[in-house]
Amino acid sequence: AREQVFKTTTWGVIWIPISSGTSGVIREMAISRSDPNTLYATSGAAIYKSTDGGVTFASVTSGLPGRTITSVYVHPDSANVAVITFSGFGAGKVYKTTNGAASWINISGNLPDSPVNDVLIYYPGVATNVYYAAMDIGVFFTNDYGATWVELADGLPNTVAMHLDYHQATNRLRIG
């Protein structure tokens, strides 16, 4: 049962499995805001995509490094745009698709060789080219779709950043 996606329409009172499962434990999942039938789920180094609300999944892992995927984020305006991050060391920390995961582009740019734990597309109600990456060595941002990354150091402790959250109504970024 742990390899399945579950759904509730009763605020968590009743949960119904909606998928036949993946080949492993689901680590991360993201649902498109613009098309709720599109969702991505990760399992280890694999990523799967569903376009039928999670009933069926197809692997969209081709062309990606063989490391554990640590996060997936779908652009609020387009189910075809998603960004994923990887653990471990070596080239290729952040990848992006603009064609619904038919192909992936390495947008790691000049990121340091350290695991990336989370990613967020900054979206204050209009499309931007700003992304944030939470890493084992701090938080980095890009304003050119990943070509160059800059560390956010002012006022932040030198510590592991595991999670990013953006609240659009207050325009606040939270880091955990």
What are these regions (language model features)?
Residues 1-176:
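Extracellular glycan-interacting surfaces
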